[in-house]
From Swiss-Prot:
Subcellular location, record wording: Secreted
Repeat region (Sequence), residues: 67-88, 89-110, 111-121, 122-143, 144-165, 166-187, 188-207, 208-229, 230-240, 241-264
PANTHER family xrefs: APOLIPOPROTEIN, APOLIPOPROTEIN A-I
GO biological process, alphabetically ordered: adrenal gland development; amyloid-beta formation; blood vessel endothelial cell migration; cellular response to lipoprotein particle stimulus; cholesterol biosynthetic process; cholesterol efflux; cholesterol homeostasis; cholesterol import
Protein name: Apolipoprotein A-I
Residues annotated as signal peptide: 1-18
SUPFAM superfamilies: Apolipoprotein A-I
Similarity remark: Belongs to the apolipoprotein A1/A4/E family.
Amino acid sequence: MKAVLLVVAALFLAGSQARHFWQQDDPKTSWDVVKEFANKYVDAVKESGKGYVEQLDASSLGQQLNLRLSDNWDTLSTILTKLQADFGLATQEFWDTLEKETEWLKQIVSEDLQDVKHKVQPYLENFQKKVQEEVEHYREKVRPLGIELRDGARQKLQELQEKLTPLGEDLRDRTREHVDVLRTQLAPFSEEMRQRLAKRLEELKDSATLADYHAKASEHLKMLGEKAKPALEDLRQGLLPVLENLKASILSSIDQASKQLAAQ
């Protein structure tokens, strides 16, 4: 299972080659994608949390208990931002180490992908050429019908539609044939790529790299937890005033309710 995870990690880190197989633009790095997602998530939590706090303060229950949660929200938001920054630095260090440790596997998989791409390219180009020929052939058949429509106006619209229908069906059927041919041609290469990945996985299982990586990954995860502790403690300390205020408000309301019942 650890070997599978390592291969998946390498493939993810090699995503700049695999996901952008046919693109020329420089893709985002793996860490940039993770960091962007995390930042958006934390920002969304802070914004939605602030809205919920304001709604709770404005509610009849909030006013009755005198919660005043909004007074502490800015402090909590600051602590959460600090937690986000501290955790991000520790996570980036772990991610950079993971990328460095799997560079060799990423390079091998990238070479395999490029090799298969080189073999598949002629079939893709031939498929594109065939489809373009079919479309051009269809245009040649349709062109005189368009001229006929302009000359015959509305009364021939139905007749034109009847003539176009079989032409469109013919184009669809011929394109399907080319797709089936392409699928048959590419099937061996798909199997070849599967076998190559299986071979890399077996090589990885038999190497000492996996055990070494597991030890390093465990060490970095432990370091990540240690670095996150101070920020989590700050968050806990920031929550204490809110919880104490909430507790005091609830106890005060219970005490008032008890006095009212006793007075009756």
